[in-house]
Amino acid sequence: MAASVCRPYVRSLPGVMPWRSSSCHYEYTAMHHFLGSFQKLPFEPFNTGARKIHTAPVRSLFLLRPVPILLATGGGYAGYRQYEKYRDQKLEKLGLEIPPKLASHWEVALYKSVPTRLLSRAWGRLNQVELPYWLRRPVYSLYIWTFGVNMTEAAVEDLHHYRNLSEFFRRKLKPQARPVCGLHSVISPSDGKILTFGQVKNCEVEQVKGVTYSLESFLGPRTYTEDLSFPPASSRDSFRNQLVTREGNELYHCVIYLAPGDYHCFHSPTDWTVSHRRHFPGSLMSVNPGMARWIKELFCHNERVVLSGDWKHGFFSLTAVGATNVGSIRIYFDQDLHTNSPRYSKGSYNDLSFVTHANKEGIPMRKGEHLGEFNLGSTIVLIFEAPKDFNFRLKAGQKIRFGEALGSL
């Protein structure tokens, strides 16, 4: 019965052999050719009368469509950001502190895996390439327009004078452009933006509001106290107490961020004596305020140069922190310092004492004296000891210029 029903349909298929007498063999041969025809012929739409239903390969169902996925991802992220904004507004109305949104360990590790040291070295080499005379003005003008550089303050305003980007970044200022305040004991060592300032509490320094880093991790262990004019504290004292050498004093800090358009040199913030230099090879992550709010202990991860010594009120230190494309930190009186060098490995530090048999005090620095320079914008961190009545004359987030007062007694 099955053979008689299928015979009219199967005979019409091309390539089907004549039927044999055996019904079993007949059914097998017909069905074999019936199925084999689908491998030879392209798929045709089945006509169902009013409409056609087209078949498609199964693999096309699994093809990723980037535009809808990107739109869905972007919409989800935008919605999440709106939720965070709404939540922060609610917390602000209730008078509650908004918790900082810190990067996770894997996010920090992923960022540190980017070869920023190698990229910064390549950027440094590029900065040394001499530009053709006709190209200098358009290149420097674009940089001036992008970062808001005030060239009227430069000692040389002619853009053709600067042979390469490095010379332009390290341009000198006119003497009258940055008058040094003589009334206050501590001045700003550079142009920039005040991120944080205040007392150091519980051996933690404020990176930005709500985000801190370890004082000991930042400065390193006190293994060089024999070079300074005061003895080390006992081991049972906290690290902070080891730095505070006089009774009744407190430890203070101030963080200044230098943007790419700022004056890149830094100066002595007070009259003091530099006794020791410690160089920490490290990462070169961005140190802009947004990253400082996102990555905890950012300054401890990055390459930095710590200059420490003492001033009239006790311990004083200035730390130059490197950043992306700012692997070059130069200290004018330290010819042995070579930052972002492949011979140094992360996680170590290199010490140099300026106290010798011939010079038992170190290197004296006068307030406002040239101290060093960055290749591009970065960060300066001051940590110093002062009496309890020391007052900062600052506001968080304010712009400041070299020579202006930071605080006074």
Swiss-Prot record:
GO terms for biological process: lipid droplet formation; mitochondrial protein catabolic process; phosphatidylethanolamine biosynthetic process; protein autoprocessing; regulation of mitochondrion organization. Residues 1-52 form a transit peptide. It catalyses: a 1,2-diacyl-sn-glycero-3-phospho-L-serine + H(+) = a 1,2-diacyl-sn-glycero-3-phosphoethanolamine + CO2. It is found in: Mitochondrion inner membrane; Lipid droplet. One of its GO terms (cellular component) is mitochondrion. Residues 53-63 are mitochondrial matrix. Binds 1 pyruvoyl group covalently per subunit. Is synthesized initially as an inactive proenzyme. Formation of the active enzyme involves a self-maturation process in which the active site pyruvoyl group is generated from an internal serine residue via an autocatalytic post-translational modification. Two non-identical subunits are generated from the proenzyme in this reaction, and the pyruvate is formed at the N-terminus of the alpha chain, which is derived from the carboxyl end of the proenzyme. Its cofactor is pyruvate. Its EC number is 4.1.1.65. Keywords: Cytoplasm, Decarboxylase, Lipid biosynthesis, Lipid droplet, Lipid metabolism, Lyase, Membrane, Mitochondrion, Mitochondrion inner membrane, Phospholipid biosynthesis, Phospholipid metabolism, Pyruvate, Transit peptide, Transmembrane, Transmembrane helix, Zymogen. Pathway: Phospholipid metabolism; phosphatidylethanolamine biosynthesis. Belongs to the phosphatidylserine decarboxylase family. PSD-B subfamily. Eukaryotic type I sub-subfamily. Catalyzes the formation of phosphatidylethanolamine (PtdEtn) from phosphatidylserine (PtdSer). Plays a central role in phospholipid metabolism and in the interorganelle trafficking of phosphatidylserine. May be involved in lipid droplet biogenesis at the endoplasmic reticulum membrane. Heterodimer of a large membrane-associated beta subunit and a small pyruvoyl-containing alpha subunit. HAMAP family: PS_decarb_PSD_B_type1_euk. PANTHER family: PHOSPHATIDYLSERINE DECARBOXYLASE (PTHR10067), PHOSPHATIDYLSERINE DECARBOXYLASE PROENZYME, MITOCHONDRIAL (PTHR10067:SF6). This is Phosphatidylserine decarboxylase proenzyme, mitochondrial. It comes from Cricetulus griseus (Chinese hamster). The lineage of its organism: Eukaryota, Metazoa, Chordata, Craniata, Vertebrata. The gene is Pisd.
